[in-house]
């Protein structure tokens, strides 16, 4: 009964935000070339595989499950086939994953902090996105973006990033859809109650931006993508700001919150 009440309230919230929402990431609209200056594309020997967020000239935040033994990061990218004059490529110098992470659980502390081998220079298509100053609230309008699949079942990867607006949902919605989502995991639940808008395969590690603040990291979701009862699950960035700042300051022994 409680869940039915939650879903009813969220549907009302969703309808109130409908006019603010763009088209779908899945089957939807190309991002404006100037709205993702902080978006990082991860490539390895097989090609593009994850996204990330530039938070200052030397540091990138992504998902822990995007870790790979051999990868590069490209910034200033829009089309993967058309070179921007200010694109920059970097290698990871150091990688930080929560030392108290349970490696058998992808949803547990799914965050990775990367120090670049060389600072990034701000340019027309490159600029960092600051860490959040406050936590997000349920009902917030959130922006998702990435080069992930734009079709929900058979993966179709675009050359350009796609964007959409979704809403931050009550955590109970995701707990109902994902029995494996434990209450202690520091995650956010975001999507559309009636389905159809979602991040998908290849969007992992990219940002969830709520009311202009970097609040989440694409972590986990259902297949096919875009199912209303199973919204996307995002690592809650605000809960890790202290850990991020301590590592940037040189305290590499810092532990993440439990």
Swiss-Prot record:
Domain of life, source organism: Eukaryota
Regulation: Inhibited by NPGB, leupeptin, aprotinin and PMSF, but not by EDTA, SBTI, heparin and hirudin.
An annotated GO BP: proteolysis
Glycan attachment positions: 44
Pfam families (alphabetical): Trypsin
GO molecular function: serine-type endopeptidase activity; toxin activity
UniProt-listed Enzyme Commission number(s): 3.4.21.-
Xref: PROSITE patterns: TRYPSIN_DOM (PS50240), TRYPSIN_HIS (PS00134), TRYPSIN_SER (PS00135)
UniProt similarity note: Belongs to the peptidase S1 family. Snake venom subfamily.
Function: Snake venom serine protease that has fibrinogenolytic activities. Also possess esterolysis and amidolytic activities. Selectively cleaves Arg-|-Xaa bonds.
Protein name: Snake venom serine protease Dav-PA
């Amino acid at each position: 009964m409680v869940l039915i009440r939650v879903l009813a309230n969220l549907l009302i919230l969703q309808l109130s935000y409908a006019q603010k929402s763009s088209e779908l990431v899945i089957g939807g609209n190309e991002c404006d070339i100037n709205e993702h200056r902080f978006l990082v594309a991860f490539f390895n020997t097989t090609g593009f595989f994850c996204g990330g967020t530039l938070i200052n000239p030397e540091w990138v935040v992504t998902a822990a499950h995007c870790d790979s033994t051999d990868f590069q990061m490209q910034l200033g990218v829009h089309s993967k086939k058309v070179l921007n004059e200010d694109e920059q490529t970097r290698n990871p110098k150091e990688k930080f994953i929560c030392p108290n992470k349970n490696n058998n659980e992808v949803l547990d502390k799914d965050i990775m902090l990367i120090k670049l081998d060389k600072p990034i220079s701000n340019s027309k298509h490159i600029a960092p996105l600051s860490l959040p100053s406050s936590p997000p609230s349920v009902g917030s309008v959130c922006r998702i973006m990435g080069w992930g699949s734009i079709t929900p079942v058979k993966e179709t990867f675009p050359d350009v990033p796609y964007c959409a607006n979704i809403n931050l949902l009550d955590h109970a919605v995701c707990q109902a859809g994902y029995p494996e989502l434990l209450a202690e995991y520091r995650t956010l639940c975001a999507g559309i109650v009636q389905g159809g808008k979602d991040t998908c395969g290849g969007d992992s590690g990219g940002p969830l931006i709520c009311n202009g603040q970097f609040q989440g990291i694409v972590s986990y979701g259902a297949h096919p993508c875009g199912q209303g009862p199973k919204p996307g699950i995002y690592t809650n960035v605000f809960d890790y700001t202290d850990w991020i700042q301590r590592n940037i300051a040189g305290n590499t022994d810092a532990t993440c919150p439990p």
